Regions:
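Thiamine diphosphate
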Residues: 1-157
């Protein structure tokens, strides 16, 4: 991810004290920088996407706005039940960010292909689905999404 993307994440944390960043394993490559600056608002869940999504829903019920970063294939498939029951149905204000969508991580094998994440999330009518084509578009969407109390999924191939 680019410097511009990291700056975008830092701005989200700086501008809104109710935002948190939850990340699974290596979804955010500069995770340690964010965690050093915001140790109580940036949490690494390791390879535990399902627990991370349920935790995010709990935070949302307390008025927080969690941004949940995960490798798209694992975030959408391993945690789909939690996304459905904990985020979509109660309309929890959770922002799901599927990183490295499509075949971006093809070097790691077909388990890392996220070619059906849109189809899965698209079955959940309560979740707004975005596929930004640029960091500028992502910035606009994140800024607007902070004012909307509903779940979202961002499919990123940036």
């Amino acid at each position: 991810m680019s410097f511009k993307f990291h700056k975008l994440i830092l701005n989200i944390l700086k501008q809104n004290p109710n935002t948190l960043i939850l990340s699974s394993d290596n979804a955010l490559r500069e995770f340690s920088v964010f965690q050093a600056l915001f140790p109580k608002r940036v949490i690494n869940f390791g390879i535990s996407e399902a627990n991370m999504v349920s935790y995010a829903a709990g935070l949302s019920s307390c008025g927080k706005i969690p941004f949940v970063f995960g490798i798209a294939s694992f975030l959408t498939m391993r945690a789909f039940e939690q996304i459905r029951y904990d985020v979509a149905i109660p309309k929890s204000n959770v922002k799901l960010i599927g990183m490295d969508a499509g075949c971006s991580l093809s070097g790691f094998g077909n388990s890392h292909y996220a070619i059906n994440d849109i189809a899965l999330i698209g079955t959940l009518k309560q979740i707004r689905l975005f596929c930004p084509a640029s960091l500028d578009e992502l910035h606009s969407l994140f800024t607007e999404d902070l004012t909307v109390d509903s779940p979202s999924y961002y499919r990123l191939q940036l």
